[in-house]
């Protein structure tokens, strides 16, 4: 029954919101439509022969198909999932994971940066500071949030509140989901590179636990500005890279259509980054991706946050800073090809 309701909701979403169906998802959606039609038929007629048995077979086939497809996604496919318009954003996770969240505004230099959302909240009754990118769901929100690409004011606001968290001994949890820092001329004039560098320099020295989670896109300096922490987590189908596949293809081959080749070369998936010791943990998503089940994705992330926060709280401030510095200093070690 739950599967029937899930399929029905998915079909209604497709019709109502015209959600994006990714190329590798088309067979999955076609099979879901077939199951939905058979379920509707079974409700109309009580005696339809072996229709119940057929539905059961198709449900098993659907589960296997989802598992096979999502277990073998390449870099570009993962990028498309990470950018999926229905993928849960920071505010969705706040709703499911935290309580008593209160958004604070302003960088105290005349700006706010709405691409960054930040404020205190409670995580299982523990006061924490939550900071993250917010892309926006519809076009109006996306424009207001600048598609998750923050101006310097957003990063300065984030730093102000992280320093507040340090003052009150509150752990910091950041949610990373951005194509990158806003690259406009006005952002550069306002000190974009300085704002990012100052955040990184300051976060490495903060004497409270910091957990960073890549929930969608982790784009270059825009991600690093709130991505220096004791533990770096990535959702299974998120990506983390110095540049987008399109940008990489345009620079290396002067052909943005070589995005698949670029995505593979960038090694931007969670599995790659765990292997390279850039991140510490992969948080598995519900079968079919987090965009299919926001609540279940949040439950899994909450469990991972609870485990990591419990471990970090046992470490003293001096040791936290020392371990964090060592963690980032050893990144990017040169190795011989083939070793």
What is each stretch, according to the model?
Residues 176-306, 310, 314:
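Conserved catalytic cores of soluble enzyme domains
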Residues 16-127, 295-339:
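Intrinsically disordered, low-complexity segments enriched in small/flexible residues
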Residues 1-15:
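Single conserved hydrophobic/aromatic residue that forms the stacking wall/gate
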Residues 71, 100, 110-112, 118, ...:
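Glycine-rich beta-alpha loop segments
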Residues 7, 151-154, 266:
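Short, conserved glycine- and acidic-residue-centered signature motifs
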Residues 79-82, 143-147, 288-291:
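Short hinge/gating elements
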Residues 31, 74, 130, 177, ...:
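Terminal peptide-recognition signature
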